[in-house]
Amino acid sequence: MTQYDERQMHILDQALNRFDSSRSVLEKHLPYDHQVAGHTKEILCKYNGYILKPLVKPDLFIRELSLYEEFESIYPQDDEKFMFAKYYGAVQAITHHNGVVHYIVLSDLTLNCKIPCIIDIKMGQQTYEPSVSELKKLREKQKYVYQEEIGFRITGLKVYDSECQSYTITDKKFGRSLLPDQVLDGLALFFYNHKTLRLDVLDIVIHKLNRILNWMLVQTRYQFYCSSILIIYEGDTALNEDVKHSVQVKMIDLAHTICVDGLVDTGYIHGLRNLIGYLEQLKEMSKTEENTLEEYNRVVQLINIPEMIPFVSTEAFEGHEVVDSSSS
């Protein structure tokens, strides 16, 4: 049983009451089948339109829970929290080992998608907190030596190939293997469905990223370390629904966020600006059929070079049964 101090217990009680004042324990939750990144022990679950993020390390769990609770008081209106998944509190649930684990309850961002395409992008020039050991800093820097230069890296993606009716899935090593001149191609992979570049999606994603950037430029309370941006869109172009309802761009994985006073998060801003710049470049290139074909060929070549093949897989689409979870 995890031991919390009085302040931590207050945060946990507040979060548990927010979701369900009766404190009932969930039993019918299922593994989440669209996780493309995250630590191997942090397997998400789903329940009635919610995503359940489990307690793995108690201190980090409470920190993230505390942050979401703070957002609820600082930003009382939902539209003020547009950059985050909707937060519902915390809950206890039975594990497959018949133990009881606490979970953070968030909205399922894939709920409006029949065939969701998902990319997880680790943001910031620095993916470790300033207080960690020199060894930890070195290990984090070695994960992707271009993180400081580029300000982000792809930690996992799955994109639907409409021609083959299957998913292309990459793991964490794919993103770490991208050289600076390959990053555009890595991002392009996510917006191609084998037939065309999803310009309709790209426009919305750029708009939403700019909204987050504008918020980051004025907020001076939070420094986000080891946090990601999750981008989701509907992969089935045969649906006649408006694509904008499926496109989600959210900041996730907030456990390593530090509260500060009077400082903008320059590392995160650097990464956001570069990410938006790459996507603008991709959009510009797609204005001619010749450039679009050239970029698509570059993407195909990228995922078929010997160094990349071990990091890319293909799985047939069977409803919502594709699972890919790995440490980021």
What are the functions of these language-model segments?
Residues 1-328:
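Polybasic, positively charged surfaces/segments
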